[in-house]
Every structure is written in C-alpha cells, then in structure tokens.
Amino acid sequence: MDLDPRLRILLTGALFATGGAAIKACTLPGPQISAMRAVVAALTLFLLLPEARRLPSARVLLVLPAYFGSTFLFVVANKLTTAANAIFLQATAPLWVAMLGPALLGERPRRSEWFALVCIALGMGLFFLAGEDASATAPSPLLGNIIAVVSGVSFGLLLVGFRWLGRRGKGEQSAVVAWGNLFTAACGSLVMLALDVPFGTPTPKDWVILVAIGSVQVGCAYALLVRSMPLVPAVQASLLLMIEPALNPLLAFLVHGERPHPMAVAGGALIVGAVTASTLLARKRT
C-alpha cells in the first residue's frame, strides 16, 4: 500500500537525521565530505529516478543553487557547531517559505502554521543567546551557527522551488536533486580550491560513511521527498521535515556524547513542540 505523502515526508526527515552524527564521524573537511557525498548521491538518484536522467531544463538550473546551498552549507556548519545547532538553525526554512510562498507560489500559511513559525523564530534566537564554547566536535560554534542559518534560507528556497516545479508535473524535481548533487560536487570542489582547503585522504571508515550518507541519507531521502512535495503544501512539508531536529541531536549524543547548550535544548523543544501541534491540527482538517 502506498504511503500517505505526509508520512513519506516524515520518513525523509528521519533519514536526513542520520547525517549529523555521520558527518562528525568522518575525518575529512566539511567541503570535501559534501562534494564526495554528492557524487554517491547523484549516482543513487539517477538509479532511483529515471525521469532525472535527461538534461536539465532552464527551470531546473534556476533551482540548483538552492540545492547546493542547503546541502553544502549544512555539512560545513555541522563540522563547526553542534549537530543540534546546525539542524535547528537550518530548520528555520519554514520562515523563508512563509515569506516567499505568497509571492512565488500564491500559498499563504494557515493560522496554526504561523504559530509554529513564530515559535521557530523564538527558538532560533535562543541558539544565538546561548554563547557556547568551542569543543572537539564543535570548534567554531558562532561561525557554524551563522552558516546554518544561511543553509536554512537555502533550504527554504529549495522547498519553494520543489513546489513550483511540481506544478508542471514534468519530473523536474527529480532532475533538481540528481543534477543538484553533481552541481554540489563540482561547486564544493571549487570552493575548496578557492579557499585553499587541503583535500584529505579518506580512511576505510570514511569511505563507509560517505557511501552510506550519499546513498541513503541523501539519495533515498530526496527520492522520497520529490515524490511527495507536489502533493503537500510547501509550508506544511517544511514543518513535517522538522522531525529531523528531534532525532539528529539524539543520534549525535549517542554516537559522540555531544551535549548542546541548555538554551539550545530549550529552543529545540520549542520548535519541535510547535511543529507537532501544527501538524496534528493540519491532519485533523484533511
């Protein structure tokens, strides 16, 4: 039996959640992890999404930078700040969807979704008030937090782009994630060269991590996402995806013993609680 599109988006979020702990376990620089993961993800997506194998259209090319920003910047942020901060700050995406949706999609958030969006903004503020110290798994928290917010802006633009492309019904969303990973691999490598970031030599464990996060955490997850986005309003989809922040910090704690600041925990609880309430209300109306 085919899963409800909302459940598929929740499963997507659960797969995304495995990335934080896995990225921190990899010894390579963040930009290199992003680029190499993208190569594996592209191969997986071209296998799973036959409609993505044709050359991208001009519409698809417009959305590729948003894909690059959301995935590349998240990996970099995750190597600089805690997994909790990286994912919760990327989870500001619904704010940007709500701001851009009326103009670009003609979709306005429901009242319950606005409540969740306000809570997201308040939660985001708590992360920057925390003033966390550097640690082994979070060597530059402030810079990582800033990059994570920009990643959230990019992810919001990506969700808007998915919804926009999905209205045409031509499989262009599939092309975005497949070609977007090739775009990310190329641009990520160029960023490393431009910033003079040394390329590391992957260990056997690094290779296992890269293949796993490329094929499952990105490849399978985005295959589910592009099949579901045309069927769910953009703001609601972005809210459903925030099951990821509930799982991501937990996995980072279990694997690395990483403990986010208490104010970050409070911000995360505020966000997840609001999203859960908003999603339940939306479910009752459908």
Where are the regions that the model predicts?
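Hydrophobic/aromatic residues within transmembrane alpha-helices
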Residues: 26, 33, 77, 103-109, ...
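Helix-helix packing/entry segments at the starts of transmembrane helices
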Residues: 86-92, 162-185, 218-254
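Loop-to-transmembrane alpha-helix entry segments
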Residues: 54-58, 87-90, 106-126, 141-145, ...
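Transmembrane alpha-helical segments that form core, pore/gating elements
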Residues: 13-16, 45, 97-98, 134-196
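Specific alpha-helical transmembrane segments that line the substrate/conduction pathway
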Residues: 32-35, 39-40, 75-108, 112-113, ...
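Membrane-interface helix-cap regions at the ends of transmembrane helices
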Residues: 14-21, 39-56, 72, 121-138, ...
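Specific transmembrane alpha-helical segments of multi-pass solute transporters/efflux pumps
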Residues: 15-20, 51-90, 126, 214-232
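Hydrophobic transmembrane alpha-helices of multi-pass small-molecule transport proteins
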Residues: 45, 67, 99, 112-132, ...
